[in-house]
Amino acid sequence: MRLKELLPNFLIVHQEVPEDPIAFKSTDKRENENKEITIPELIDTKVPELADGATDTLYGLLVNGHLQTAYGSFRHFDNIYKVQYKRMIIKYPHGGEGTVDFAVNGRSTKRRKVEKEYVPTSQPVFNGNLKRRYSYYSPDDPKLNSDDAKPMLIILHGLTGGSRESYVRAIVHEITTKYDFEACVFNARGCCYSAITTPLLYNGGWTNDIRYCVNDLRKRFPNRKFYMMGFSLGASIMTNYLGEESDRTKIECAISVSNPFDLYNSAYFINSTPMGSRFYSPALGHNLLRMVRNHLSTLEENPDFKDVIEKHLKKIRTVRQFDNLLTGPMFGYKNAEEYYKNASSYKRIPGIRTPFIALHAQDDPIVGGDLPIDQIKSNPYTLLLETSTGGHVGWFKDRSGRRWYAEPLCRFLKIFHDEITVKGLKPDLENVQLPDPNCEPIATTFRAN
C-alpha cells in the first residue's frame, strides 16, 4: 500500500453493477452480430477515472465529507467555470411559470443600443453582476427553435439552487466548451432569480414541470438527442421522472449525482449527526425560508398557506419542519413523512428504461450511505458509482473549485453519444430480465384520464 492511499483525501471508485447489464448493439444484420457494448465496458475502456477500483486524490485540506460539502457553500467560485445564460420562460398548462437557462458561451449576446432588452412582465430585471451573466430570450427569438442535430444536456439543480451554482456551471462549461454539446438548466419554480406566478413551489417528486419542459424542448429541437443530469433534489426529480416515463423515455442517458434516493431516511440522517442538526439542516431550512419570503405575496394568495405562514414561518428552523408545514400540505400530503415516503425516487428505479448512472460519495453528510443497491443491481439499465470520499455534491480537486466529476462525466456523455446514439445501437433485451416497471405512483403526478 502506498502512503497516499492512507490519506483521508484519497478517492477510490467502486461500481455496483447488475449481473447482466444492458448491452447495446446494432440492429443492422450486416454488422457483426457479436459486436456489442455495455455501460460498464464503455466506462472501463473510455473513461477509466470512473472504472471500478479507479483512484484519485482530492483537495488535501478537505479531509472528509463535511469539509468537501461545506467548501461548496462558503465560496461561489466565480472565477472558474464561467458561463453566460439566456433565459426562456415556460408557461405551464397546469398553471404558473418556469425558467430554462441556455448556455450561450462564446456567442454574441450584445444588443444594439437602440434595441431595448426584452424582460418578461412577470419576471424580475437582471441587475448588477447578474446582468453580465443573464439575459432573457424573447418568445419569438429564432434561436429557440432549430433543426440542428447537436446533442443537448438538460440539468436539474439541487434544493433552492439553479443555473448559477458552481456544481452546475462545472458541467455546463465542460460539456459545451470541450464536447460540443448544447446545455440548458431547468430551474425549479421560484429558484435562481425567477418569480412564481401562482402559489405553488416544487418538491422532490414533482415531475409535471420537467415532463412539460422536455416535451417542449423536443418540439423546439426535433433533431436533437437529449441527455439529463440531476444534482441532489434535482436528481430525485429526474429519477422519479425517468421511472414514470419508463419505456416511453425521451432521454438517451441520464446521470444522478448525490441523490437522496430515500427522502425519509435522508431527513432522519441529516438530523442524526451534530453537524447535520446544527449546520446542514438549519442552512437548508434558511434557504427554503428565503425562497418563501422572496415570493411571499404570491404564496399568500392561497389562504391556507397564508395562515400557515403567518402562524409558523418564524418558528421553522429545519427542512423537515418546512416540509411538514408547507411542502407537504402544498402538494396534498398530510405531513412531511407522507410526502417523503411517497416521493422517494428509489421506488421508481425499477421503472427506469434509460441508461442511468448514479454517482454518490460514501461520506455524504446530507444523504448518508444507505443506498438502493439492490434496486440498482436488479435493473440492467442502472449502475452505481460509489466513491470513498467527496461529500455532498463536492469532489473538489483543488482550492480553485475544480470538480473531480465534471470532466469524466462529460466525456462519458460525449462517448455514449458518439459510440451508441449516433451509431444507432439499441439495447439488446433478448437475454435480460427487467424488473416490473409498475412502481408506486407519485400522488402529485398528472395522469391522462
UniProtKB/Swiss-Prot annotation:
Keywords: Hydrolase, Isopeptide bond, Serine esterase, Ubl conjugation. SUPFAM superfamilies: alpha/beta-Hydrolases (SSF53474). Its EC number is 3.1.1.23. Optimum pH is 7.0 for MAG lipase activity. Active over a broad pH range from pH 6 to pH 9. Optimum pH is 8.5 for p-nitrophenyl palmitate and pH 7.5 for both p-nitrophenyl acetate and p-nitrophenyl butyrate. It catalyses: Hydrolyzes glycerol monoesters of long-chain fatty acids; 1-hexadecanoylglycerol + H2O = glycerol + hexadecanoate + H(+); 1-octadecanoylglycerol + H2O = octadecanoate + glycerol + H(+); 1-(9Z-octadecenoyl)-glycerol + H2O = glycerol + (9Z)-octadecenoate + H(+). Disulfide bonds: none annotated. It holds the Pfam family Abhydrolase_1. Optimum temperature is 30 degrees Celsius for MAG lipase activity. Optimum temperature is 45 degrees Celsius for p-nitrophenyl palmitate and 30 degrees Celsius for both p-nitrophenyl acetate and p-nitrophenyl butyrate. A motif (GXSXG) lies at residues 230-234. There is a cross-link at residue 82 (Glycyl lysine isopeptide (Lys-Gly) (interchain with G-Cter in ubiquitin)). Gene3D superfamilies: alpha/beta hydrolase. One of its GO terms (biological process) is medium-chain fatty acid catabolic process. Residues 151-392 form the AB hydrolase-1 domain. This is Monoacylglycerol lipase. It comes from Saccharomyces cerevisiae (strain ATCC 204508 / S288c) (Baker's yeast). The lineage of its organism: Eukaryota, Fungi, Dikarya, Ascomycota, Saccharomycotina. The gene is MGL2.
